Amino acid sequence: KKVYGDNTDYIGFAKTYQKLVKRRIDKILLIGAGGAARSILQFLNDEEINQIDIFTRSLNKKKTLSKSMRFDNFIIDSKELRNKRYDLIINASDAGMLGRKNLANNVYKLVSNTAYIIDIVYNPMRTKLIDIAKASNVPNDGGLGMLLEQAKPSFEAWFNTKISISQYLRSKLTSQLRYE
C-alpha cells in the first residue's frame, strides 16, 4: 500500500499573496525554514521571483531546506539584513507568536522601505510585525487569511463537501484568537 500526503499551506499562501500583492515582486525576505516556509518557497519559485533571501537561525533547518529544495541563499545573522531592501517580507517562523520571542530588531527596521508584509502568525492576530507595517502604511496580511485559505481545501478533502469562507466563519474564528 502507498500512502499519499498533501499540504494545503501552498494553496493558503498563494491565495493570501494574490489578494495582497498588486505588482511585480523581485526581492523577498522569507523568515523561517520550517514546513510552512518550504511550501511558501515552492510557491515563490513557481512565481519566478528574482531574489529570495531566507533568514533563519537554525542551521539544521537551513541544511534540510537547502538539501530538499536545492536552495542556498540564506541569512543566518540578522546583522546581514542591515541596508537591505525587499519588495515583500514574509514571516513564516514562530517569531511573534503568542509565548514566543519577537523577530530580530533588524527585521523591523526594514518594514518602512518594504512594499508588502505577510505574517503567517495568527495568534495573536496583531503581531509586532503587523503593527509596524500598519503604522508605516505598508499593505499587510496577518496569518488569519492564510489559516482560512489553507483550511478550506483541507476541510473539503477530509469531509468531501464544499465550503466558503464566510464572514460568519471568519468572525467565529476571530473570537477565539487573541489580539495582543
Where are these regions (language model features)?
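NAD(P)-binding Rossmann-fold cofactor-contacting core
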Residues: 49-69
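Glycine-rich adenosine-cofactor-binding loop
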Residues: 17, 26-45, 56-57
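Conserved hydrophobic helix-helix packing surfaces used for dimerization/oligomerization
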Residues: 28, 52, 115-117
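Glycine/small-residue-rich loop that forms an oxyanion/phosphate-binding "nest" at active or ligand-binding sites
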Residues: 1-24
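Rossmann-like adenosine-cofactor binding region
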Residues: 72-141
